[in-house]
């Protein structure tokens, strides 16, 4: 059962599903051999084991493999890193976006936000029907849009919030000062993306949707979790440095970037790893 946040009426009852023990290779390979579609949401660090579990499978069809992971080209990268050849398996990369808050361990019920987005790389093979959630497009542009605007705002607000003694993301939307910082940050990130891709039409709507999502208290988005892995997230090609470089080249406003940089220099952030 999946209950959408803020909407008691949107409840989906999921039935007729089953599971296979991962160490039961015979049953696992038999089930995979009959598949039309194989997807994952196991974390990018586990994708190699997923690929390796398919090496000896004799597929009856030509299934599509899509890794729904928060990583650049998760599907194709995992396949290349595995350094294997799997006959008939089609690989498609996807940019996925949905916030899943901490779940109860007392049942199989899952509560998620109502918003969801899957943008698959536009290829002749289309494993899903297009809908409000699913679309096909330019993978590179969609990945950068999410990385810079959504993940970039997430990172800036995490450090700004921790420096202001906040614990959860939604607490940054409780007063005018923090709301102003949030809006200024996302406006700068949106500007950076438009400098990267001037043809995009939906950036303003995208920004408003992100602010609405981040302000939802039901998500329980812990700032210390968002701030983790700073060596990766502040990398030159990542969500902070890459848009900042573009803004600097165009003499644009970088005030919120400067604020976060000062926080990094002056605050005691030893709890972040």
Label each region the model flagged.
Residues 1-30, 34-273:
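Substrate/ligand-engaging "lid" and interaction regions
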């Amino acid at each position: 059962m999946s209950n959408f946040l803020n909407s008691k009426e949107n409840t989906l009852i999921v039935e007729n599903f089953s599971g296979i023990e991962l160490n039961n290779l015979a049953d696992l390979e038999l089930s995979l051999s009959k598949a039309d579609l194989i997807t994952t949401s196991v974390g990018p660090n586990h994708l190699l084991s997923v690929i390796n579990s398919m090496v000896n499978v004799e597929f009856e069809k030509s299934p599509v493999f899509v890794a729904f992971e928060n990583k650049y080209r998760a599907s194709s990268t995992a396949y290349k890193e595995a350094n294997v050849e799997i006959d008939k398996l089609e690989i498609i990369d996807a940019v996925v976006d949905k916030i899943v808050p901490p779940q109860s361990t007392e049942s199989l019920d899952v509560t998620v936000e109502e918003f969801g987005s899957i943008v698959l790389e536009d290829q002749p093979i289309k494993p899903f029907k297009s809908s409000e959630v699913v679309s096909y497009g330019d993978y590179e542009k969609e990945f950068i849009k999410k990385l810079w605007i959504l993940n970039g705002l997430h990172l800036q607000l995490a450090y700004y919030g921790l420096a202001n003694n906040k614990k959860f993301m939604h607490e940054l939307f409780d007063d005018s000062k923090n709301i102003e910082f949030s809006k200024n940050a996302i406006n700068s990130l949106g500007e950076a993306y438009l400098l990267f891709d001037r043809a995009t039409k939906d950036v303003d709507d995208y920004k408003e949707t992100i602010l609405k999502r981040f302000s939802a208290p039901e998500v329980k988005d812990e700032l210390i979790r968002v701030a983790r892995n700073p060596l990766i997230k502040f990398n030159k090609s990542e969500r902070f440095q890459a848009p900042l470089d573009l803004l600097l080249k165009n003499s644009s406003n970088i005030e919120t970037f400067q604020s976060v940089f000062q926080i990094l220099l002056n605050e005691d952030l030893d709890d972040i790893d």
